[in-house]
Amino acid sequence: MFNLDFDFSLIILILDLFGTVVFAVTGALRAIEHKYDIVGIIILATVTGILGGVMRDTILGVFPPNNFSDTIHIVFTTITAVVIFFLYHKTKKYENLFNIFDAVGLGVFTLTGVSIAHSLYSTNYVLIVISGLLTAFGGGILRDVFVREPPMVFTKEVYAVASFIGVIVFLILINLRVPFEYTAIMVIFVTTGIRLISIKLHWNLPRVKM
């Protein structure tokens, strides 16, 4: 993986796998809504779950990307897709399931993106911000493109802004030497919270009215 100490690596791996599963759920749900077969569901779940991390590793110069060199992420997305395939009719009554999973995934992947970038390039704030944002919604953009929908990050409520605020929270707390575990909780809580509140209250960024 990355050249990090054991505890940090383990925490990031656990969070990364959790975020991968959460985003894989959103990919599987989108695929089912668009009447994909089981193979299509697995592919879209995998695209959504891992390609944000692949983009992150690419700009950080990590080759091959961790999600390809360690197949555990693909195993997790495949299992997740199959589970959703069989349980979909039991879960579809929960109307907000997609939004909840997407918001949690946004928070977790914002954290893992900035954490890994900071561990490698602690003084390159531009790279840290880009890494956090790409990890957070890179897979989601490709998910929406695959099903021919406008990417949520560009159209739905407050999305990219929530991730960006999470990145800023991370940088502030890390520079204040707040312990990583507390920083992690705050980043996930703030990013996910802003996203869910924006959905609930229908917050949107300004756009041109046609």
Predicted regions and their residues:
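Short, structured motif recognition centered on aromatic/hydrophobic residues
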Residues: I43-V47, V54-L60, I130, L134, ...
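Structural signature of hydrophobic alpha-helical transmembrane segments
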Residues: F8-T20, P65-I79, N124-A136
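N-terminal topogenic module of multi-pass integral membrane proteins
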Residues: M1-I50, V54-F63
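Helix-coil boundary and interhelical linker segments in multi-pass alpha-helical membrane proteins
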Residues: M1-S9, T58-F68, V114-L127, I172-T183
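Small-residue-rich segments of transmembrane alpha-helices in multi-pass membrane proteins
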Residues: L44-G53, D102-S115, A136, V158-L171
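C-terminal ends of transmembrane helices
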Residues: A24-H34, D57, V82-E95, I141-P151, ...
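Ordered, amphipathic secondary-structure segments that act as subunit-interaction surfaces
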Residues: T78-A117
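Cytoplasmic-side transmembrane-helix entry/capping segments in multi-pass membrane proteins
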Residues: V39-V47, D70-I74, E95-L106, S131, ...
